[in-house]
Amino acid sequence: MFKKFLWRDCVFIIVLITTIALPAYIHTNYPQAFSRFFYPVEAWFTKRDLRCSKNAPHFLRQLLIEMIDEQKSLNNQVAFWHNGQLFHCESGWEDGFRGEKPMRVNSRFRYASVTKVLTSALVLHAINEQKLSLDSKIIELLELPAPKDPRVAAITIKMLLEHSAGFDRLKTYTPMLTMDVKPWCPTNLAQLSETKLDFDPETQFQYSNVGYCLLGAAIEKAYGRSFQSVAEDYFQLKKYGVSYVGDGFLPDEIQYDYRFEPFYAESYSKHFDFKDSLYAVGGLSGSAADIVQLLAALPKETPLTIFSHNHAPCSINILDACYGYALQPYQASRQSYTLWGKSGFFPGVNTDVFLDEQGNILATFRAASTKKTADTLLLRQYAYSLMNEYVNQK
């Protein structure tokens, strides 16, 4: 009996140690795996407290659920501008799961590449004011030396706007986002004359961060002052609560979720030059409600608007196949509704804005990296289907 008692006692101790020690070991050595395992539980709690403004369209709540379930983001904002009125919904917390600060309509996110919409709008405004033109050669405008690659001399403002200038970040690693390396744009612009392009300008579309940095430099040259100063005057950024990030995080910026981020963690922001190099590329911050209200208030200028585009043929029924001067048009097969969008990403945050030419504006902000990049395309298609249905039932 004593031996039997010892055997049972040993089994109990082993089970007890395993139950306590194994989770502690996993949590300490594999924190992402631990937090990923518990995500479904956290998602269930989060969905029990979705907060929406009065009379918010039902599809905003549907988007929040999609963002929680499929995009793996607990802490989210959705904002919608329709007929001169703002509607919004939020989920989660500013400071992490079950935190002390519920997500609010004015909680601050990084806009990431959604910033480029405003950079484009500022360039189009400068063209409308005849301070720039679509055909302005960037080498001549910036008064740079003759380039070693003669194709660089052909690059125009139009090519930079629509990502057809010859830069391919998949072939040549973007100088804007190399860890712990100061980008040559915009602080050493003469390096453009040393650059070899990845393809002949205007022969293909390839997304480019350096192209939008050069557009920021073009604005500074055209107006004779900093890009931030010109942007503040034109957009009235402070009025809308929109501000530039620096190196590190802003005091009122939300906490981001990196559990599904494959490489970067919270310290990533210290390794990139947000303050001096990324302001025109991905340097703005604010809420989803801030950006839709700012875009709704853009002056109605002519001849160019943020919906302007090159009329060269492209596959509008494929996401990311077409580029306008500010936004990317998408129209699903067998549909007549066109939605224009722009997406942004930094580690721990995904942002999207969607606009149509009827004046509807939607923004979806997620404070988390997605599990798979392809999931972000699914969200954009889902947003299109919901917007298409909502607009056409009115």
From Swiss-Prot:
Keywords: Fimbrium biogenesis. PROSITE patterns: BETA_LACTAMASE_A (PS00146). Gene3D superfamilies: DD-peptidase/beta-lactamase superfamily. The keyword Chloroplast does not apply. It holds the Pfam family Beta-lactamase. InterPro entries: Beta-lactam-related (IPR001466), Beta-lactam/transpept-like (IPR012338), Beta-lactam_class-A_AS (IPR023650), Diverse_Enzym_Activities (IPR050789). The keyword Transport does not apply. PANTHER family: BETA-LACTAMASE FAMILY PROTEIN (AFU_ORTHOLOGUE AFUA_5G07500), BETA-LACTAMASE-RELATED. This is Probable fimbrial assembly protein FimD, serogroup H1. The lineage of its organism: Bacteria, Pseudomonadati, Pseudomonadota, Gammaproteobacteria, Cardiobacteriales.
